[in-house]
Regions:
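N-terminal pre-catalytic "stem/leader" segment of glycosyltransferase-like enzymes
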Residues: 2-71, 99-291, 665-708
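Short hydrophobic beta-strand element within catalytic cores of glycosyltransferases
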Residues: 82, 156-161, 569, 585-596
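Active-site and donor-binding regions of nucleotide-sugar-utilizing enzymes
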Residues: 109, 235-379
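A nucleotide-sugar donor-handling region in carbohydrate enzymes
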Residues: 191-196, 200-217, 341-420, 441-448
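Conserved catalytic-core segment of nucleotide-activated headgroup transferases in glycan assembly
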Residues: 241-258, 377-534, 645-655, 672-677, ...
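Short acidic alpha-helix that forms the nucleotide-activated donor recognition element
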Residues: 292-296, 554-564
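Acidic donor-binding loop of glycosyltransferase active sites
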Residues: 298, 563-573
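Catalytic binding pocket for nucleotide-activated donors in carbohydrate/polymer assembly enzymes
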Residues: 511-520, 574-645
Length: 708
């Protein structure tokens, strides 16, 4: 029942649900205590509402956001509590006492301070929100960007300001209970004094040298940097916070480009969720600002997603535009008709080319280039996995990864196995004999569209956690507590060092300060990469090799899960195509029940897979391949399919990718040279046809008149 209430209220935990209930019940209790009247009861209810409200705000509760939508926002709740305190004084037969008038005057004056406080905080935030935010771009030498105000002044500023009424409320309650007018006066004085002080502390940040430069100066500095840096290849991305992984997967590839790279983002939220990189990053939310940027040296633009904002860069004719996507699969999204707006579409292997031919959505065959998948380099075949990771993966109890995709937007039952087959798959895996370990890593979008998918995910999570608890109590499975303790100590050390390195990046500032100081330290970047690799090894060794796990969040990454797994179960998505790079056995669920032959006909990536029905009855074939690799009947098919989907192993994918960039850059330059030649020829023709005694208008002629 509690879990149902948590889902309905959209809160994160039972504690959050309890705090929400206390807020809802606390205000009626305040009114009742004021009417009785009872000072102790009122004080107790006030403490409860203060603490519960603060807890919900600290958690960023969904309910708190909803209250503001029904005119019960933060300011209203504080005002109601203060009015009820005045009611308490009236009910205590103190209508003519100076403290009553003082309380009323205090709360009126206190609320009069809210307007300048809110105006100042809004003005500071707006002025510090520059038209462009960057990383790894040297703006510090070009414009002066002052330090951000102390975080304690702006972070949750409205809540902090309103909580200054605590002194007045406490003092008035002391007076109501004990008759001490001095306590009331002191509380009222502190509330008003601190409120005025808060407003005064904000004033310096809206004047003088504490104000960041205007937008025109920032944009001019960006153009000056672009002219000096001369970017040649751009990775362009626009999307929601949850889609940041789509651009993050290309960062290492951009770092390894031969051409000078630049990343252009359109949303600040993507910049905030961007993984560390050495590539210069420019976030330009405004379309007009982007279209006015000087990108004349860029010859190739790469697009990782088909979104409406792409048009703002697609309109630039001096560069060639390429769709590279964010995964290679047989989903309809992989053959989006929108792709025909690009000069070229790059696919991993021959399968991508054939996919467009079959779909017949207007993408020309000569516009398709096979470049491999350079971001798959971290995926390793089992024999290439380091020994430390193989030990952690537990060769005696092989690991099977269940990585279903999400439900999608269209309600197609074939999108994900999680609803119709997920529980069957996990039940059979946790009950397998000989045993296997299950890693369950759902797609981060799971449950965002379909409540049914969200419910299935929670049931599968509970199933995995229950099986893990049962296995931990099973004496057949032995662990090494000393080794696990050592690994956990190593994890703590690595995480502490990563925290220090993250703090050294100046993360305490705001966006403007991050733009000023956000030039990556190459040595620190290398150290972070090394530490993350060490963290991954320590993570897998920090718990028994037989322990089932639910893995969510950014770490460990999907490819890390690939490397410790002997096999995978998934759905039609780029996850399958990526896993094929490992050469390991895999199974794919036919959730739409098309039948094996039709399912394989429609989906290239499953041609070397074990095909599962929703009952998962065929799962035994996958487990047989794990236990006896030499007798695996699909091993040869997987090798052939890997080449078809992902291209040849040689030359390396990054080399193919660099060659494709260079080739397209030459085409772009040839086009631009042709345009310049035509423009020159047109100008010569105009001069040749000019009447005797006339000349063509010069750039500095104001009316186009000629001179004799």
């Amino acid at each position: 029942m509690i879990s149902t209430a948590i889902r309905v209220a959209r809160v994160g935990s039972a504690a959050e649900l309890a705090a929400a209930a206390l807020v809802m019940l606390g205000f009626p209790c305040l009114m009742l205590a004021a009417l009785v009247p009872s000072v102790p009861a009122f004080a107790a209810a006030a403490v409860v509402t203060y603490l519960a409200d603060h807890y919900l705000h600290r958690k960023g509760s969904y309910l708190i956001n909803r209250l503001s939508k029904v005119r019960a926002g933060l300011s209203i709740r504080f005002l109601i509590r203060q009015l009820l305190l005045v009611l308490l004084l009236v009910r205590l037969s103190l209508p003519g006492h100076a403290v009553l008038y003082g309380a009323i005057a205090c709360f009126i004056a206190f609320y009069s301070l809210q307007a300048p406080h809110g105006a100042l905080t809004t003005l500071i935030r707006n002025r510090r929100k520059m038209p462009v935010a960057t990383r790894n771009v040297d703006l510090k030498s070009r414009i002066r960007i002052p330090d951000a105000p102390p975080r304690r002044l702006l972070h949750r500023s409205a809540e902090k300001m309103l909580h200054l009424d605590l002194f007045a409320v406490a003092g008035i309650l002391v007076f109501a209970g004990l008759g001490s007018a001095v306590a009331a006066a002191a509380g009222i004085g502190l509330t008003l004094g601190l409120g005025c002080l808060y407003v005064l502390l904000l004033l310096p940040y809206v004047r003088g040298r504490k104000i960041p430069p205007k937008g025109e100066a920032v944009l001019s500095a960006i153009d000056d940097w672009l002219a000096a840096y001369r970017p040649e290849t751009v990775l362009y991305f626009s999307g929601s916070r949850n889609s940041a992984y789509q651009v993050n997967m290309w960062l290492q590839t951009m770092e390894r480009l031969d051409a000078r790279p630049l990343i252009i983002l359109r949303e600040r939220v993507i910049l905030n969720n961007l993984a560390p990189t050495t590539v210069p990053v420019v976030c330009v939310p405004g379309g007009v600002h982007l279209m006015n940027m000087d990108l004349s040296t860029v010859r190739v633009a790469l697009y990782a997603a088909n979104v409406g904002k792409n048009i703002h860069l697609l309109r630039v004719p001096t560069m060639k535009h390429v769709f590279i996507g964010h995964g290679d699969s047989d989903k309809l999204a992989s053959v989006n008709p929108f792709s025909k707006v690009y000069d070229e579409v790059w696919t991993a292997g021959r399968a991508g080319r054939d996919r467009y031919v079959i779909a017949d959505v207007g993408v020309r065959d000569d516009a398709i280039v096979e470049v491999g998948r350079p971001q798959l380099a971290p995926i390793q075949a089992w024999e290439d996995v380091p020994e430390a990771l193989r030990d952690a993966a537990g060769e005696g109890v092989p690991t099977v990864l269940y990585a279903p995709t999400w439900e999608g937007w269209d309600g197609n039952p074939g999108n994900t196995s999680i609803v119709l087959a997920g529980e069957n798959i996990v039940e059979k895996l946790v009950q397998a004999d000989p045993p296997v370990r299950v890693l369950y890593k759902p797609h981060p979008f799971t449950g965002t569209v379909s409540a049914e998918a969200g419910a299935a995910h929670r049931r599968i999570t509970a199933l995995v956690e229950k099986a893990a608890a049962e296995r931990a109590a099973d004496r057949r499975f032995a662990s090494d507590p000393a080794a696990q303790a050592q690994a956990k100590t190593e994890l703590d050390r690595i995480e502490a060092r990563l925290a220090v390195l993250a703090g050294a990046d100046g993360g305490k500032g705001d966006e403007a300060e991050a733009t000023r100081d956000g030039v990556v330290d190459i040595e620190r970047h290398k150290e972070v990469a090394r530490l993350r690799a060490e963290w991954n090894t320590a993570y897998w060794r920090s718990f028994p090799a037989y322990e089932h796990r639910v893995i969510t969040g950014a770490e460990p990454r999907l490819y890390d899960c690939f490397n410790v797994s002997a096999a995978m179960v998934s759905d039609i998505s780029s996850v399958v195509s990526d896993f094929i790079a490992s050469g390991k056995p895999y199974a794919v669920t036919d959730s739409a029940e098309l039948g094996v032959e039709e399912f394989k006909r429609q989906n290239t990536a499953v041609r070397a897979a074990v095909i599962l029905s929703n009952s998962a009855a065929e799962l035994g074939s996958l487990l047989d391949a794990v236990r006896a690799p030499a007798a695996d009947p699909l091993a040869g098919d997987r090798k052939e399919l890997k080449r078809y989907l992902l291209g040849p192993d040689e030359p390396k994918s990054i080399d193919q990718f660099n060659a494709a960039v260079a080739d397209l850059a030459l085409k772009s330059e040839a086009r631009n040279a042709g345009q310049r030649s035509q423009a020159g020829a047109a100008e010569d023709a105009e001069l040749a046809t000019a009447l005797p005694g006339q000349r063509s208008p010069a750039a500095d002629d104001t009316d186009g008149a000629t001179t004799p």
